C-alpha cells in the first residue's frame, strides 16, 4: 500500500495568514485562513507593517488550527512548503521563518514555493492539470499569460507593462467611493449598470500578449473628475460596468488568442481577480465557442491561501526540489527562473 504524502503549507505573502495540510497533492485536509481585511479597510489598502504584525500574532495559532482540523500531528507531516515570494518582504519572512523553525525542530524537508505557481496549482485541486495549457494570472500584483508544457514549466508569454489588473480595480473603486477591497465591490456594482462610457481597450502591439491598464484607469479617474467639476450626476454602476467590460474584453481576447497560437485546448485562470463574475462568464462564453476547456478555481481558492501552496509544493516534493535552512523571503522572483529545468 502506497503511503500518503502529507504537506504542511504556509502562506503569508500579503495580508492573509494561512496554513494548510494537503494529502497526496490534491486533497485538502485543512485550510485555515486568518484574514486581515478589517484591519486594512480604514487605510484603503494593505499597510505592510500592519500586515507583518498580524502575521506575527497569528502564525502559531494558525499552524495549530490547521493540524487540529486535519487531525494530524507534526510527526505525520512529510514536508513543509512555504511561499518564499513574491510578496511583501516583511510578511513573507514571518511565514518563511515559521516554516524553517518547524523544518528544523521536526527534521522535515523544506519546500520553497513561488506564490504565482501556487495560484496556478489551485486549479489542480478541482481538476487535474493536463498539458499543454495557458494560464491567465490576474491578481492585485500580477497580470500574466503563462504557457505550460508540463508540471512546473513556466514560460511567461505576456505580462502587464504598468498596473496589474487588481491594482486598476482598487484605484477605480476608490475613485468611485467604494470600500476596500475594491475589486469585489466593482464586480457587484457592474452587474447592476449599463455600458454607457466609451473607456479605452488597450491592445498594445499587434500579436503582443502584454497588458496595460494605466491608461484605462486614468480615463476612468479623469471622467469622474470632469463630471464632478461640472456637477454632472455620476451613475456609479454604469462606471463600474463600462470599466469592467473594458478590462474583461482585453483579458478574454488575449487569453483565447494565446490558446489558438500555442495550439492549446486548456485554459486555466489564477489569482484573486479570477473570482470576478464578469470575467468568469466572459471566459466561459468564449471558451465554449472556441472549444477550449476552461478551469477556474472556486472563489475561496482564488484568493491567497495555503492549500494552493501545498498543492504546488507536492509537485516540487516529487521532483526533490528542497531548500536548506538558509532559505529567505524574496519580494520579487521571476517565474521563469523558478521553472523546472
Swiss-Prot record:
Main localization (coarse): cytoplasm
Binding locations of Fe cation: 115, 119, 304
Reaction catalysed by this enzyme: L-threonylcarbamoyladenylate + adenosine(37) in tRNA = N(6)-L-threonylcarbamoyladenosine(37) in tRNA + AMP + H(+)
Keywords for this protein: Acyltransferase, Cytoplasm, Iron, Metal-binding, Transferase, tRNA processing
Cofactor binding note: Binds 1 Fe(2+) ion per subunit.
Binding of substrate, residues: 137-141, 170, 183, 187, 276
Described purpose of this protein according to its UniProt entry: Required for the formation of a threonylcarbamoyl group on adenosine at position 37 (t(6)A37) in tRNAs that read codons beginning with adenine. Is involved in the transfer of the threonylcarbamoyl moiety of threonylcarbamoyl-AMP (TC-AMP) to the N6 group of A37, together with TsaE and TsaB. TsaD likely plays a direct catalytic role in this reaction.
Family membership: Belongs to the KAE1 / TsaD family.
Full protein name: tRNA N6-adenosine threonylcarbamoyltransferase
Amino acid at each position: 500500500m502506497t503511503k500518503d504524502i502529507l504537506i504542511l503549507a504556509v502562506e503569508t505573502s500579503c495580508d492573509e495568514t494561512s496554513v494548510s495540510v494537503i494529502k497526496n497533492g490534491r486533497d485538502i485536509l485543512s485550510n485555515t485562513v486568518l484574514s486581515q481585511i478589517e484591519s486594512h479597510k480604514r487605510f484603503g489598502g494593505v499597510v505592510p507593517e500592519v500586515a507583518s504584525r498580524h502575521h506575527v500574532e497569528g502564525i502559531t495559532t494558525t499552524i495549530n488550527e490547521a493540524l487540529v482540523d486535519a487531525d494530524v500531528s507534526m510527526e505525520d507531516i512529510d514536508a513543509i512548503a512555504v511561499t518564499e515570494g513574491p510578496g511583501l518582504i516583511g510578511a513573507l519572512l514571518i511565514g518563511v521563518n515559521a516554516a524553517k523553525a518547524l523544518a528544523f525542530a521536526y527534521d522535515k524537508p523544506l519546500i520553497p514555493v513561488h506564490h504565482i505557481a501556487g495560484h496556478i496549482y489551485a486549479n489542480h485541486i478541482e481538476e487535474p492539470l493536463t498539458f499543454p495549457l495557458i494560464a491567465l494570472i490576474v491578481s492585485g500584483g500580477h497580470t500574466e499569460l503563462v504557457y505550460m508544457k508540463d508540471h512546473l514549466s513556466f514560460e511567461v508569454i505576456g505580462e502587464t507593462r504598468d498596473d496589474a489588473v487588481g491594482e486598476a480595480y482598487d484605484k477605480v473603486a476608490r475613485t468611485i467611493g467604494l470600500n476596500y477591497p475594491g475589486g469585489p465591490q466593482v464586480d457587484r456594482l457592474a452587474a447592476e449598470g449599463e455600458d454607457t462610457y466609451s473607456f479605452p481597450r488597450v491592445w498594445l502591439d499587434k500579436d503582443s500578449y502584454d497588458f496595460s491598464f494605466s491608461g484605462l484607469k486614468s480615463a476612468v479617474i479623469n471622467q469622474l473628475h470632469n463630471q464632478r467639476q461640472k456637477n454632472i450626476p455620476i451613475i456609479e454602476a454604469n462606471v463600474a460596468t463600462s470599466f469592467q467590460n473594458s478590462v474583461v474584453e482585453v483579458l478574454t481576447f488575449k487569453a483565447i488568442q494565446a490558446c489558438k497560437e500555442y495550439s492549446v485546448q486548456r485554459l486555466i485562470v489564477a489569482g484573486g481577480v479570477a473570482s470576478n463574475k464578469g470575467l468568469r462568464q466572459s471566459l466561459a462564453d468564449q471558451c465554449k465557442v472556441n472549444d477550449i476547456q476552461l478551469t477556474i478555481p472556486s472563489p475561496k481558492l482564488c484568493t491567497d491561501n495555503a492549500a494552493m501552496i501545498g498543492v504546488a509544493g507536492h509537485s516540487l516534493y516529487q521532483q526533490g526540489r528542497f531548500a536548506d535552512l538558509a532559505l529567505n523571503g524574496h519580494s520579487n522572483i521571476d517565474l521563469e527562473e523558478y521553472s523546472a529545468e
